[in-house]
Amino acid sequence: MNRFTPSLLQMTRPVSGRLLALLALMLVMFGCQTKDRSAIVTHRVWDEWAVGQVVDARTGLAVPMQPWLEGLATYEVIYLGEEHHNRSHIDAALTVLRSLMSQGRRPWLAMEMFGWDGQPALARYLRSEESVRSEFLEQVLWKQNWGGAFEDYEPLTEFAKDQHLPLLAMNPPKSLIRQVVKQGLVQAKEQPEWRQWGMEGEGIVDAPAYRSRILSQLQDCHGGGSPEDYQSMYEASMVRDEGMAKTLAAAMRPLRVEASSGQGPLLSYTGGGHVQYRLPVPDRVARRVPDGLKQVTVYMATFERERAAELHQAMQEGIADYVWLTPQGAQGPPRRCR
């Protein structure tokens, strides 16, 4: 036994009243600490969420709406990722556009729903005072490229027309994407259409993080396919995202020149899958515009109380910079894969 080890007699000697009081105080203190720690662990930040809020994904806390909207004007590119067929997401985009214009800015709008082959018709429609809707949809190749109800996106298109805002067709033509699906990327690159649409020499970057996430989602949403099927779908996804990034990066060159005159920001409006974790389009744009591009991602999501914890987990994984909690669309909650 060394001198630092108390003897059995010392360890069992009667405890003084003063020591008992000290022990009692320590128990109270530790009890309070345990209670506080438990409160921190069990507090669920998503219990405070509500429809209409914008949540900072880093903190899980809602941000004041008006200052946040005003702050968007400081970015060069704003990515809004929607759930298809949800009118509240169109309304959110209109809110952002109006806020930017109220600050003396002239935002440019880019939409996934229009293909490159429809850009000339889209430009004519925006300039014309006497456009016929049915003729416009035929000329812009709406059915061929998107195919959904134009009514879903008409408010955004008409806003750009009424306010004389530039509107960019963001998506590569559907015919080009079909070639990739049917033939594979290597063979598609050899076709005349690849050169026709300015894709010759374009880097189609196969980033590991992107591959892992997109392939996993394809397999979850399209079960039963062969490895070859998934590879061709994945390659088509890469080409779409790279093509949309090409559109945005090209727009940034004149926007930066004219920024001092109030032009911009560039508002990208796509499905949320092209925004998630910055992997599909934002990272590709940043690679193409490397000079300190300032961009922000906003993921718009139907707020379902029972799925709030799942959404919080996605925020912690970095699904976007901000998540805009919205009502569900007329068709109900979005389809979930598996």
Where are the regions a protein language model picked out?
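N- or domain-start disorder-to-order transition segments that initiate the globular core
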Residues: Q33-Y75
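Zymogen propeptides
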Residues: G60-L61, M65-M101
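C-terminal regions of proteins
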Residues: R37-W49, T157, G243-L267, G272-R338
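A substrate-binding/cap region within the structured catalytic cores of diverse enzymes
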Residues: P120-A251
